[in-house]
Amino acid sequence: MDVIKQAIVDWLREILVGGIISNLSGLYDSTNTRVAEIAGQVGTTPAAWNSSIYNMIRSLSDNVILPIAGVVLAFVMTLELIQLIVDRNNMHDVDTWMFFKWIFKTACAVLIVTNTWNIVMGVFDLAQSVVNSAAGVTITQASLDISSIVTDLESRLMDMELGPLFGLWFQTLFVGVCMWALSICIFIVVYGRMVEIYLVTSVAPVPMATMMNREWGQTGQNYLRSLLALGFQAFMILVCVAIYAALIGNITVSDDISYAIWTCMGYTVLLCFTLFKSSSLAKSIFHAH
């Protein structure tokens, strides 16, 4: 009877150990893949990231938004002229320099609107150069491997009782689902930022048309700050990955399999949290809202 009981226990142990090893073997693959893509994704300009989307957005900006920007420009510069006249005591203290000043500001406004796309892309080219320079300094190769953290994994599992094995099997199953969810979160942050960039750049001529007006100029200035925040968010993301790489690189070899699994997951949750915070942090630095 004891022989049969032991045979059943050994059979269940082999099944649980096989299931745990199977769960652990690909536990961090999806997350490692997403993390490895981050440096390349955030270091790419809108033109290089997806040429078809870029061309579509530029076409919309030039053919749909630019005429609207022309109307906005005419309105704000007319408003500027009226304000200049009112400030000069309703033409009683008028001088010719006032009109030269208005003509100069209008010419600058037209120059800004007609070169909006070059200005916007210049911001992201600047951000790309910063990210590429930082990528050469920071550690961005971050890969989790449970076998490097827990030595002699299979032999340790075979020495465990059925109860702890069943609990560990359930933990690996749960952590596996969580790691898939975290990899999706990383995907959302990285790709969502690029979609946001395309959305913001598509309407660029309208806020840029307000730049030279005293009252409406804050719209254009805040738009530029938003562009800088989006551009330098890539730098923040790269720093997050570098910190994550340093943290997992310092994970010590552990005898506790459960502790090792949850530690790796904890660092990945921390990475996702900081990636989501990178947008608000960049906007607060540049006072964009």
Language model: regions and residue ranges:
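Alpha-helical transmembrane segments and their helix-start/interface "positive-inside/aromatic belt" motifs
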Residues: 1, 5-8, 12-23, 94-112, ...
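Long, low-complexity, intrinsically disordered extramembrane tails
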Residues: 1-3, 283-289
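Binding/recognition "hotspot" determinant
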Residues: 1-72
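Non-cytosolic segments of integral membrane proteins
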Residues: 16, 20, 24, 106-203, ...
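Internal transmembrane helix-loop-helix hairpins in multi-pass membrane proteins, together
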Residues: 35-65, 85, 89, 109, ...
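Hydrophobic, aromatic-rich alpha-helical transmembrane segments
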Residues: 60-64, 95-99, 103, 165, ...
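Alpha-helical transmembrane segments
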Residues: 208-225, 252-253, 284-287
